[in-house]
Amino acid sequence: MTEYLLILVSTILVNNFVLVQFLGLCPFMGVSNKLETAMGMSLATTFVLTLSSLCSYLAYEYLLAPLGMEFLKTITFILVIAVVVQFTEMVIKKTSPLLYRVLGIFLPLITTNCAVLGVALLNIKKQNDFMESILYGFGAAVGFSLVLTLFSAMRERIAAADVPEPFKGGAIGMITAGLMSLAFLGFTGLVNI
């Protein structure tokens, strides 16, 4: 049980995929202008990351490894992620058409989010078992959601602030992301996995 808690703390805070490992920066910068959009993207990414982590583990352990075709893991994981994203897109379209319209192009772009593929590949590299793979994916998703939500809230406040002309737009966003990354580096050494 303690090991599972350490995996969650490690993926959420210590080894955050966006601010420490620099994976998933495209949706981080692209969807963070409004808090509502960021929350929707966070929920969709959490669902996709957790489910694709599970499906990728199963595909590797019960299809690729027994057949000696481990070299196909990247292509297989991309296909698995694409299927999970399509499933998520259909669910969101049926349950929340407004959220579906707000997310727009960013929902299909979860397929190419390097954090999703990175989690699947790191699960295999770390030789995580079934439960550890699910928790690793869920923790990475919660960490992504936490950072995206905090960053979008800060960007909304910055948009209302008096920012010097050269720093408006993407420049102040990058500075803010850098400061957040430095803050998360303070968690280094908290958990050693």
From Swiss-Prot:
InterPro entries: Ion_transpt_RnfA/RsxA, NqrDE/RnfAE, NqrDE/RnfAE_oxidrdctase. The chain crosses the membrane at residues 5-25, 38-58, 65-85, 102-122, 134-154, 171-191. Keywords: Cell inner membrane, Cell membrane, Electron transport, Membrane, Translocase, Transmembrane, Transmembrane helix, Transport. It is a multi-pass membrane protein. It holds the Pfam family Rnf-Nqr. It comes from the Bacteria. GO terms for cellular component: plasma membrane. It is found in: Cell inner membrane. GO terms for biological process: electron transport chain. Its main location: membrane. Its EC number is 7.-.-.-. The complex is composed of six subunits: RnfA, RnfB, RnfC, RnfD, RnfE and RnfG. Part of a membrane-bound complex that couples electron transfer with translocation of ions across the membrane. Belongs to the NqrDE/RnfAE family. This is Ion-translocating oxidoreductase complex subunit A. The gene is rnfA.
